[in-house]
Amino acid sequence: AVIREENEHWSYRVNQGEIESFGKAYIQIYACDECDFERLLLRLVKQASRNGAAQIHVRDNTGHLKIGYQAEYFSFDTSYNQWKLVKTTKVDSKTNGVAIQAVSLDTSDSKLVEEYCNLENECFKQVPGGVKRTSKQLLLDIAEGERCFSLCKGDAQVGFFSAKKIKNEETGEEFFELESLGVSEAFRNQGIGKEGLLMFEQLAAENGYEKLSMICADSNPAIYLYERLGYQKEKMLSTWYTTRDKKRDLYEQENKQ
């Protein structure tokens, strides 16, 4: 599912593991000679399209790719940036009045682990950069320090969040990072997302963390909630461009008529 290649002309990484689940492929071009860029880009996006990707995300570290870039029948018309957001811990005792509990995920119960993954994957299906996580990967991430919580309303699991301690290798500063936060579609617009964020902040304060962080795309509507609650953009981590196979889209449209 993951292809890597590096030589004297280019260096790239392609993740096609999300095609079956989300219809997405992710291409990262780290280096490429300008004279070879379009040829390499076309080869990679065509390969992803042939393998079933309806939407192709490309991160270009070379600076060659811009909005409006055209390569045969692929045009790169939209983009989004991934940002690191930060906030100093400040616990707000105010809640939304929503009767929500945060329940630590019981990793010994395989059914609960699977249900957690299913909800997480469903929530992230439309999120920019969203990737599918298997039960096996979730358990590996937990073993490496990630803490996962189900947001429950009565007996119903209505959402989730996960967090992990992150250390800045350059400064030695420690952050408590929000790894994920999501709400089931049937329970959205009820203040549950905000409630989950406040619970994350409470958990950070209880464990003595002074700095909070998260990574979020500026095309993700949730970023407006985070900014309203005091999170600030500290650093832009990457820019991603999106494209589709317009030739395949036209073919599929004609065959539906």
What are the roles of these predicted feature ranges?
Residues 62-80, 194, 206, 218-236, ...:
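Conserved active-site alpha-helix within GNAT-family acetyltransferase domains
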Residues 34-46, 180-183, 189-202, 227-228:
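Conserved acetyl-CoA-binding loop-helix of GNAT-fold acetyltransferases
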Residues 1, 95-131, 252-257:
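Short amphipathic alpha-helix that is part of the acyltransferase structural core
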Residues 81-103, 210, 215-220, 232, ...:
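C-terminal "cap" of GNAT-fold acetyltransferases
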Residues 1-48, 161-179:
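Conserved donor-binding loop and adjoining core beta-sheet/short helix segment
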Residues 56-60, 178, 212-216:
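Conserved hydrophobic beta-strand within the GNAT/NAT acetyltransferase core sheet
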Residues 32-101, 240-242:
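Acyl-donor-binding surface of acyltransferase catalytic domains
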Residues 1-8, 127-154, 162, 168:
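Active-site rim helix/loop that mediates acceptor-substrate recognition in acyltransferases
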